[in-house]
Amino acid sequence: MTAWDGVLPFYPQPRHAASFSVPLLIVILVFLSLAASFLFILPGIRGHSRWFWLVRVLLSLFIGAEIVAVHFSGDWFVGRVWTNTSYKAFSPSRVQVHVGLHVGLAGVNITLRGTPRQQLNETIDYNERFTWRLNEDYTKEYVHALEKGLPDPVLYLAEKFTPSSPCGLYHQYHLAGHYAAATLWVAFCFWIIANALLSMPAPLYGGLALLTTGAFTLFGVFAFASISSVPLCHFRLGSAVLTPYYGASFWLTLATGILSLLLGGAVVILHYTRPSALRSFLDLSVKDCSNQAKGNSPLTLNNPQHEQLKSPDLNITTLL
C-alpha cells in the first residue's frame, strides 16, 4: 500500500463517467426545498383549505420545476444499443459495449460502457458532452475529443452532429433546441405571473396566464419536434444500428403543457360558472372576489351639504 493508495498522483487518472447533471440536480433540490418548506407549514392551515392549498402548491411547483429542469436534461431525443464494435483507431481489437445517445436542448451527450466494464486491460466507462450553445464551439470540442483519443463509437456519433457533417443534424438540432429553450423560458415567466395573479383577487387573469404558460410550453415541444422533418442518418455501430426516439423530457414537457392548459381552462370556466367553488379552492374571501365575479361594483357617494341642511341624504349610485 503506497502513500496514495496505489494511485500515481503525477499522471493522468482513469476517467470516471459523470452520473448526473449538476445544474439539473440544483434545480431539483431548489424546488424540493420549496415543497418541503410548504409541507412544514401545512399543519398550520385550518379546515379543508389545507388540502386545497396542498394540491394547488404541489401542482404549481411541479409545473415550474419541470419547465426549468428540462433545459438541463439530455433526454429529449435518446437512443441505446448493445453492440460489438472496434474500440480504438488503427487497432483490430473489438469490445462488447453499451452505447447511449442523449440529445438535449443545449447539446448531445454520448455514453460508452463496456459489458463487462473491464476489457482490454482498462475500464470502459465514458460520458462525453458536446454543446452547441451560442457561446460554445461544437467543432472545437470535437477536435479536442480527437486529440484526446476518445473511443471510436464516441467519435463516430459526435462526428454526425458536426456542422460539416453531410447529415445536417447540427443546424436542425441547434435551431430546434434554441427556439424550444426560448419558448420554455417565456412559459416559465408566465408561470410566475399566473402564481402571482392566483394569489390575488384576480383568478380570471391567473387562469389566462396559466393558459399562456401551457401554450408556450407546447410551442417549445413543437419547436423541438420539428427535427422529425429531417431525414435521420443511420447510426451504425459495429454489428448494430442505433435508432433514436423521443425521450422522457419530451413527453414530460408535452404532458406539462397539456396539464397547464387544462388547469387554466378550468380556472376560467369556474370563474364564469362556479365562482364560489373557485374562491373556496383558491381560499379567497367573498369580499375580494365579488367585484370581479359580478363584473360591476356600486359606488355610493354621500352629499355632505344636505347633512348640514338636515335634509334627507342624497345617495348617488354609479355602476362602474
Swiss-Prot record:
N-glycosylated. Residues 73-183, 228-249 are extracellular. One of its GO terms (biological process) is hydrogen peroxide metabolic process. Glycans are attached at N84, N109, N121. It is a multi-pass membrane protein. Residues 43-51, 205-206, 271-320 are cytoplasmic. Its main location: endoplasmic reticulum. The keyword Transmembrane applies. Keywords: Disulfide bond, Endoplasmic reticulum, Glycoprotein, Membrane, Protein transport, Transmembrane, Transmembrane helix, Transport. One of its GO terms (molecular function) is enzyme binding. InterPro entries: Dual_oxidase_maturation_fac. It is found in: Endoplasmic reticulum membrane. The chain crosses the membrane at residues 22-42, 52-72, 184-204, 207-227, 250-270. Signal peptide: none annotated. One of its GO terms (cellular component) is cytosol. Belongs to the DUOXA family. Heterodimer with DUXA2; disulfide-linked. Interacts with CSNK1G2. Required for the maturation and the transport from the endoplasmic reticulum to the plasma membrane of functional DUOX2. May play a role in thyroid hormone synthesis. This is Dual oxidase maturation factor 2. The lineage of its organism: Eukaryota, Metazoa, Chordata, Craniata, Vertebrata. The gene is Duoxa2.
